[in-house]
């Protein structure tokens, strides 16, 4: 039976009314949710909350969280910023909503330092990132890969022990960060490029250390241009200019290393290193291809994050042990009981030393290498703890605040490894599943070097504590524990200490 025109007109009107009502309901729903943004401070005109962050944003944000709660929303320039300051809030963003927050927002560091986000750290979550991550895990960062270059770590640490023992023999203080950078850069150079980057600890390795520290510092700055893109070209703080100058230095170094690696290819026949492996597998099944710029950017990630983040935690841990000699002595007694004093500390010893592991966890808690996780951005609007988070909102997880939360940690400003020997905290692990302790982040964008970072902290710190007695130079009345803000938390004043060998002298010979 034919349908009359009147019926069709009625259906059309009903459909139009339905769609209009649907749009109205959606509009009202969205607007009602906008009024349910997470609480946060009222910022300045144009700049928003930027001036409120000061020179120590992680501390300022931790103080704001005491007033506004575990999830805050700040208008920073023209951008929205959500800040998570408790384990529960961090878990909501980094686990429950992990996929929605799997990309990085555009920023000057990615553009001017990381080859326009052609690296693994700042790349969007997609085929190129997956390829870089896969290659890194297979050959250098995964569990099986780490076992494969254990001897390299042992050998390079031997060179460092010898240099430190020589400093002690001549009555000279050891500058810890310089020694660590020298050793770690050479470890990575051996496995990535089949060469020691620095022949000896000196001006060249110290210059590299200064470059790494500068990169990790400027990359952590809150750059006005990142939050008010319309004025980014003005570079009001001079940050972008500094990044460009620093990038030229790193690019020259990486270019030289790649050229030397190509020239020595005949020496590695049958023994490919990480770079050979990457070049041989630069194409994947999804049609993604790694170009020279991607390889440079990946090496930059490895050399900077691989040397700085772990070394800063080790330096902080040693500083805390010097301030707490009872803890230092107890750690040495544990090692003497398990290892003795007739051989070096080995990686296999770590699992038998619960107090050392507790010291490392306490260092990760109190001095996380990255106080604010690398920023992420919401791909879609979402809801967290009943609050509306708009699409395009940037996310910052305050790892430092979680580690200093008195509701989680008794006397959080004290360095007390025993807290990780107590029943409720004994099983807490820093690998990203226990949100009370996430020094490397969590979720699919967790630091790719998490396994390596934890291993280096435990192995190198354990070796240094077992191998030497430590004390401050006589000229130091009180140890400076100040921390300037950056992508990684450095000591404002590098730790310099006197060391005395505890083991037979032949053990220190490389």
Swiss-Prot record:
Pfam families (UniProt xref): p450
Catalytic activity: a 3',5'-unsubstituted flavanone + 2 reduced [NADPH--hemoprotein reductase] + 2 O2 = a 3',5'-dihydroxyflavanone + 2 oxidized [NADPH--hemoprotein reductase] + 2 H2O + 2 H(+)
EC number: 1.14.14.81
Positions annotated to bind heme: 447
GO biological process, one term: anthocyanin-containing compound biosynthetic process
Gene3D superfamilies xref list: Cytochrome P450 (1.10.630.10)
Needed co-factor(s): heme
Pathway: Pigment biosynthesis; anthocyanin biosynthesis
Molecular function GO labels: flavonoid 3',5'-hydroxylase activity; heme binding; iron ion binding
EC category: oxidoreductase
Domain of life: Eukaryota
KW Cell inner membrane (keyword) present: no
Keyword annotations from UniProtKB, A to Z: Heme, Iron, Metal-binding, Monooxygenase, NADP, Oxidoreductase
Record's function text: Catalyzes the 3'5'-hydroxylation of naringenin and eriodictyol to form 5,7,3,'4',5'-pentahydroxyflavanone and 3',5'-hydroxylation of dihydrokaempferol and dihydroquercetin to form dihydromyricetin.
Family assignment from sequence similarity: Belongs to the cytochrome P450 family.
PANTHER family: CYTOCHROME P450 98A9, FLAVONOID 3'-MONOOXYGENASE
Protein name: Flavonoid 3',5'-hydroxylase
Organism, scientific name: Eustoma exaltatum subsp. russellianum (Bluebells)
The encoding gene: CYP75A5
């Amino acid at each position: 039976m034919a349908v009359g025109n009147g019926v069709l007109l009625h259906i059309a009107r009903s459909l139009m009314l339905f769609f209009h009502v649907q749009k109205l309901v959606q509009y009202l729903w969205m607007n009602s949710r906008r009024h349910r943004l997470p609480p946060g401070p009222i910022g300045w005109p144009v700049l928003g909350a930027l001036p409120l962050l000061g020179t120590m944003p992680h501390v300022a944000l931790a103080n704001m969280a005491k007033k506004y709660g575990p999830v805050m929303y700040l208008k920073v320039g023209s951008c929205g910023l959500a800040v998570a300051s408790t384990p529960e809030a961090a878990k909501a963003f980094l686990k429950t909503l992990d996929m929605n927050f799997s990309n990085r927002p555009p920023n000057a560091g990615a553009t001017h330092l990381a080859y326009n986000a052609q690296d693994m750290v700042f790349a969007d979550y997609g085929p190129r990132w997956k390829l870089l991550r896969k290659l890194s895990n297979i050959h250098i960062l995964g569990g099986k890969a780490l076992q494969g270059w254990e001897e390299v770590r042992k050998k390079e640490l031997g060179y460092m022990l010898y240099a430190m023992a020589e400093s002690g023999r001549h009555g000279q203080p050891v500058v810890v960060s310089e020694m660590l950078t020298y050793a770690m850069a050479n470890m990575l150079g051996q496995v990535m490029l089949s060469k020691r980057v620095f022949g000896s600890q000196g001006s060249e390795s110290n210059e590299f250390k200064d470059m790494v520290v500068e990169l990790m510092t400027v990359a952590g700055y809150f750059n006005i241009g990142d939050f008010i893109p319309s004025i980014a070209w003005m570079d009001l703080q001079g940050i972008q200019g500094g990044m460009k100058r620093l990038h030229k230095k790193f690019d020259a170094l990486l270019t030289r290393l790649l050229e030397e690696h190509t020239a020595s290819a005949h020496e590695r026949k049958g023994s490919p290193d990480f770079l050979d492996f990457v070049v041989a597998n630069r194409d994947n099944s999804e049609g993604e291809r790694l170009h020279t710029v991607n390889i440079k950017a990946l090496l930059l990630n490895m050399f900077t994050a691989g040397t700085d983040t772990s070394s800063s935690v080790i330096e902080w841990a040693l500083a805390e042990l010097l301030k707490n000699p009872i803890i230092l002595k107890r750690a040495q007694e544990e090692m003497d009981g398990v290892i003795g004093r007739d051989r070096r500390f080995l990686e296999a010893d770590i699992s038998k030393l619960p107090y050392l592991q507790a010291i490392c966890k306490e260092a990760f808690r109190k001095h996380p290498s990255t106080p604010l996780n690398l920023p992420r951005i919401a791909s879609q609007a979402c809801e967290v703890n009943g609050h509306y988070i708009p699409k395009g909102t940037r996310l910052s997880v305050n790892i430092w605040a979680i580690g200093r939360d008195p509701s989680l940690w008794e006397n959080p400003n004290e360095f007390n490894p025993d807290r990780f020997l107590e029943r409720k905290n004994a099983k807490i692990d820093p690998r990203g599943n226990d949100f009370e302790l996430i020094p490397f982040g969590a979720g699919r964008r967790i630091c790719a070097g998490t396994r390596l970072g934890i291993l280096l902290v435990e192995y190198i710190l354990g070796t240094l504590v077992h191998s030497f007695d430590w004390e401050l130079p006589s000229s130091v009345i009180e140890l400076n524990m100040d921390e300037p803000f950056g992508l990684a938390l450095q000591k404002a004043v590098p730790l310099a200490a006197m060391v005395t060998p505890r083991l037979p002298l032949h053990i220190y010979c490389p």
